[in-house]
Amino acid sequence: MRRSTDKILTTHTGNLPWVDAPDGSEADFEPRLKAAVSDIVKWQRDTGIDIINEGEFTKGGDWLSFMDGRIGGCEVRTDTDNRAAVFKGREQQVFADFYKYAAEAGTLFYLADGQIKVQRNYWVCTSAISYTGQDALAKEMALMKDAAGTDDVFLTSTAPASLEPYYENEFYESEEAFLFAIADALKAEYEAIVEAGFLLQVDDAWLPALWDRIGIDMGLEAFQKRSMLRVEALNHALSGIRQDKIRYPLCWGSWHGPHVF
């Protein structure tokens, strides 16, 4: 990662607006995606941003759902215990009227044209977890490399703690074994990004954001213990990768609602 004593280097955390983004089904999607990546790279450089990415356009503009299909051994389920944990938090209880109104109005999560984002899939792991995203990742890296090279360029991935809320375990003998299996799968993606010459950004929004969902009820000490196990899993996934190749942003939750807890 480049450092400077002459200027404050600038960057951002990944997601940039693609106002006329197609949904992926159009016949001209691939050339439009390539052109959009090229344009957003040029915009960042013309703006003076030093460390850039592809705006997460190759990921559909979403920091997490791009992982769908990259984790083997799991199947989609419509109703899981984890789904309840993610969407039922203290703020939803205290501000119940607001969340009811916002959910009906579609203002919590929306796209540039006002459409609500597609709900995330929820998965149940029924066999050994593996990484199956090699082709999708290779395509992302090729588009980014073609548009910008690899110097001062980052690509994003997801931390084990932030993938876990959307996955439920029906295979591993313990929570720890399940979590470290996720970490092993993600390790393959992390290493591929760095080996290709990019900086790796590991997004971990849910590590702190679950405080409102489950942490308050379990208490601070128990939540800290829970979080530490997930930090250890992330460190396991990152083992062997130089620290100066890694970016690690946390998030308090980016939905358009009250944030008081």
Q: Where are the regions that the model predicts?
A:
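Domain-level signal for soluble alpha/beta catalytic cores
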Residues: 1-261
